[in-house]
From Swiss-Prot:
One of its GO terms (molecular function) is 3-phosphoshikimate 1-carboxyvinyltransferase activity. InterPro entries: Enolpyruvate_Tfrase_dom (IPR001986), Enolpyruvate_Tfrase_sf (IPR036968), EPSP_synthase (IPR006264), EPSP_synthase_CS (IPR023193), RNA3'P_cycl/enolpyr_Trfase_a/b (IPR013792). Catalyzes the transfer of the enolpyruvyl moiety of phosphoenolpyruvate (PEP) to the 5-hydroxyl of shikimate-3-phosphate (S3P) to produce enolpyruvyl shikimate-3-phosphate and inorganic phosphate. The active site is at D315 (proton acceptor). SUPFAM superfamilies: EPT/RTPC-like. CDD domains: EPSP_synthase. Belongs to the EPSP synthase family. This is 3-phosphoshikimate 1-carboxyvinyltransferase. GO terms for cellular component: cytoplasm. Pfam families: EPSP_synthase (PF00275). Monomer.
Length: 435
């Protein structure tokens, strides 16, 4: 894919879409399958950069797996234990938080000599909250360069026990502890300090652990968790990965802005993904939503402004911010501090790039206000190597003005076929389709 991509103005949106498997589920079940007994067949696997980093890491850790030709089915052979590697190895994990954080916790269980590292941005994403919690349970982890950030040197030693963790930065820290705890020598009691962000992702983790034979006790409204130690993960033999609801938000938003209608297949109303709440927010904004058994249909209606707390759906919240420039009144998204520690500082990035296309934007430490735009300006959008920035700003081509995305290939992190899918629902008048 070229270094920049100009999307021409779209006349209207219409079509049906099949969304690849969830990134959050894919990397979790790959890891849980590797830790389980025997063979697990995973269907509808997402095959993107973040997943490739996890697969390469598992291979280096001694796990054998097979992908089918479409790379959407993975047969993985587990070892029924935590990983223990005799030689000193280095695992490069790109900017994949869903690989870095859980692998750090799991690799802390056994005697190891493993370095975890990644891209420049990964080395800027704080991880000390998880490191501190693992150290409370006996883990021997040191920072290779800058304190509080990767790369990390792991020697093992985590035994469980009473652990405190800050829940206000990233739910992945707590998810990582939860996944490691059943394999620890001792029972683990986790006490969450401060407000827990992205709670649906914790529910997702616990749901998947249950599918692999482990139960987690949730006490005191997600402030306290209890997991028995010295357990084994048990393979479900087969597991079908839900389509990624975070990825679906861009197509739902496209219909809300410029429909026509969109039907997204492979999504159920009772999804285990927290971003199902994005669809509820669309309804609150006046968008027409119709559910079928295994799909959802979104049709354009009015698009109202909204004030919404997006603490639990930080990724989908970015799409809501884009809807703000198309809505009748402002969109106010609050309680999103963790945008600042994602693939980039997303509050800064969204504000900066939205202003380029003519939007009025007000931001604070943990909020963003986006006002409707009357006259859109063609702009070159810096994507900050952030897949969600690129996918969000693709929607600006629905404004009647073209938009140019720099480094569009960053979508490969989670959705390599995004532009192919996007073009498939775009209909143009008197211009050629984008190539």
């Amino acid at each position: 894919m070229q270094d920049s991509l100009t999307l021409k103005p779209v006349d209207y949106i219409q079509g049906k879409i099949n969304i690849p498997g969830s990134k959050s589920i894919s990397n979790r079940v790959l890891l849980l399958s590797a830790l389980s007994n025997g063979k697990t067949i995973l269907k509808n696997l997402l095959y993107s950069d973040d997943i490739k980093y996890m697969l390469k890491a598992l291979l280096k850790l001694g796990i054998f797996y097979k992908l089918d030709k479409k790379k959407s089915k993975c047969t993985i052979y587990g070892i029924s234990d935590a990983f223990s590697v005799k030689n000193k190895i280095k695992l490069f994990l790109g900017n994949a938080g869903t690989a870095m954080r859980p692998l750090l916790a799991i690799l802390s269980l056994k005697k190891n000599k493993i370095i975890l590292t990644g891209e420049k941005r990964m080395k800027e994403r704080p991880i000390h909250h998880l490191v501190d919690s693992l150290r409370q349970g006996g883990a021997n982890i040191t920072y290779k360069n800058k304190k509080k950030f990767p790369p990390l040197y792991i020697k093992g030693g985590f035994k469980g026990g009473k652990i405190f963790i800050d829940g206000s930065i990233s739910s992945q820290f707590l998810s990582s502890l939860l996944m490691a705890a059943p394999l620890a020598e001792l029972d683990t009691e986790i006490i969450v300090k401060n407000q827990l962000v992205s709670k649906p992702y914790i529910n997702l983790t616990i749901n998947l652990m249950e599918k692999f034979g482990i139960s987690v006790s949730i006490l005191n409204d997600y402030k306290h968790f209890y997991i028995k130690g010295n357990q084994k993960y048990i393979s479900p033999k087969k597991y079908y990965i839900e389509s990624d609801l975070s990825s679906a938000t861009y197509f739902l938003a496209a219909a809300a802005i410029k429909g026509g209608s969109i039907q997204i297949n492979g999504i159920q109303k009772k999804s285990i993904q927290g971003d199902i709440n994005f669809i509820k927010i669309l309804k609150q904004m006046g968008v027409s939503i119709q559910w079928k058994k295994n799909s959802v249909i979104c049709k354009k209606n009015k698009l109202l402004g909204i004030t919404v707390d997006c603490n639990h759906i930080p990724d989908a919240a970015m799409t809501i911010a884009i809807l703000g420039v198309f809505s009748k009144k402002k969109v106010y998204i609050k309680n999103i501090y963790n945008w600042r520690v994602k693939e980039t500082d997303r509050i800064y990035a969204m504000s900066t790039e939205l202003k380029k296309i003519g939007a009025r934007v007000i931001t604070g430490k943990d909020y963003i206000k986006v006002y409707p735009v009357k006259n859109f300006i063609h702009a070159k959008i810096n994507t900050y190597n952030d897949h969600r920035i690129a996918m969000c700003f693709s929607l600006i081509s629905l404004s009647g003005t073209s938009v140019t995305l720099l480094n569009p290939k960053c979508v490969n992190k989670t959705f390599p076929s995004f532009f192919k899918n996007f073009y498939s629902i775009c209909h143009y008048s008197n211009i050629n389709k984008n190539i």
